[in-house]
A protein has these predicted regions:
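N-terminal nucleic-acid-engaging modules of covalent nucleotidyltransferase systems
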Residues: 1-188
Length: 188
């Protein structure tokens, strides 16, 4: 990744999306970048519910006493390290500070928007997926239905059904990945 050049291209894309309130225009703009690897990767990292960075720009900015630490010169390597929790806590803050320390203010703002998972373009995963189908993985929690509403439609003799006790306040799914790591996801 050529950081300066790629960040400029991402910022131009963001500025174009910010320049219109029309949903159809936003979809058209996103479609123009469908073959752009960096833009698509930026959208995936920013809007995928399965990519969590465990750090916000506010946390980075408020820890003024922590000195920047250099070690990452590629945005996506840094974000991968945050997602995989290779770097955490004060180390994570220091590496992010080290990554942005020599950047122009607009570049820092862009990196912080990606870190906060919001490019501030008034777009989301649904709109992006209308323009580029399946670009952003979505997470849909199955919602319960009352048995009384389904009573005539259910045939326990010929269909397989699973039931679970509904617990108030517990609205999440546990997903075990290929490495055996269990992650919990909830509706946003």
């Amino acid at each position: 990744m050529n950081e300066s050049k790629d960040l400029k291209r991402i910022q131009e894309f963001v500025d174009r999306l910010k320049s219109t309130n029309s949903t159809n225009d936003k979809i058209d703009i996103i479609k123009e970048y469908e073959e752009d690897y960096i833009i698509e990767k930026t959208l995936k990292y920013t809007y995928s519910p399965f990519k969590q960075f465990h750090l916000t720009s506010a946390t980075v900015k408020k820890n003024k006493k922590l000195e920047p630490r250099e070690g990452y010169n590629d945005l996506f390597y840094l974000l991968d390290a945050l997602t995989k929790r290779t770097i955490t806590g004060h180390d994570a803050i220091q590496y992010v500070k080290g990554y942005v320390q020599y950047m122009d203010e607009w570049q820092q703002d862009l990196v912080f928007c990606i870190l906060d998972k919001n490019l501030k373009t008034r777009t989301g995963a649904d709109l992006i997926n209308k323009a580029i189908p399946k670009c952003i993985p979505t997470f849909k929690v199955a919602l319960a239905n009352s048995y009384d509403k389904q009573k005539g439609k259910v045939n326990f003799d010929t269909q397989t059904w699973f039931a679970s006790h509904k617990l108030d306040g517990v609205r999440c799914l546990a997903i075990v990945d290929d490495n055996g790591t269990c992650n919990f996801f909830s509706r946003q």
